[in-house]
Amino acid sequence: MKHERDELTRTGIAAVVLSLALLLSAPQGAFAQEQEPPQETHDGLTLVPDRKVAVAYIDSEADLSVYDRIMILDCHVAFKKDWQRDQKRSGSRICISSSDMEKIKADVAELFREVFTEKLGGDGGYEIVEAAGDDVLLVRPAIIDLDITVPDTMSAGRSSTYTSSAGAATIYIELYDSVTGDIFARAADRKAARSVGGYMSYTNRVTNRADARRMLGTWAELLRDRLDEFHGK
C-alpha cells in the first residue's frame, strides 16, 4: 500500500504540479490572457473561484463531512529550477552541495508534517492517523519551486543577510478518499515570506524556520477552515 501511494505521489506530481507551477509563475497579464487554467480537469474536478489560493479544483458532489480522521502523506519537496546554480552565481559565501539540498528538503518535509499535524490535529480536532480507513481523508502534499534566501545547512556556520524576504514556495495539495482513491480536491498557491511592514530585516536559519512555520501554518489553517465548513463548525 505504501509503495503504491509513493508511486502515485511521484507520477501525479510530475504530471500535474508542472502545469500548475507554470501557471503560478507566469506574469499576471500572461496568466489572464494566455494561461488561464482549464475549467475542468482530466479527472472530473471543477475549477472554483477562491480568493485565498491561486488555483483550486473540487469535486462538486463530494461530501467531506464523513471524514473525521486525516492521513498525511510525506511531503514531496523540490527546489526552484537552477536554485543551486543561482546560489553560486549570487556570490554567496555559503557553499550548497547536493547533500545539503537533500537535507533541506527533508527538513522542509518534516516541518510540513509537524505544522499540519498541529493545525489539523491539535488545534483542529481531527485525528491524525497513519492508516487508511472509511472515515480517513488522505492529504497528498508537495512543495515546489522552493526558493530560500539564506540556506540552512550544517556546514554554513553563522550565515545571515539583510533581505525583504526569506524566500518563497508553491504548495500543492490533493485530497483523496484513503480507501477508494477517489480524488475530491486539488489546489496550488504560492507565497513569499515577507518582512513585517515590507522592510529589510536580518534573515538567518532561525528566522527562515520561523517564516516557514508561518507560511505552512497559513496553508494548514486554510485547509482546516475548508474542512470545518463541511462539518458545520
PLM regions and their residue ranges:
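Surface-exposed short loop/turn segments
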Residues: E118, G122-D182, R194-T203
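Extracellular/periplasm-exposed beta-strand and loop segments of Gram-negative cell-envelope proteins
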Residues: R85, M101-K105, T149-M154, A193
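Short secondary-structure boundary motifs at beta->alpha junctions and helix caps
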Residues: R93-M101, T163-S164, V179-D225
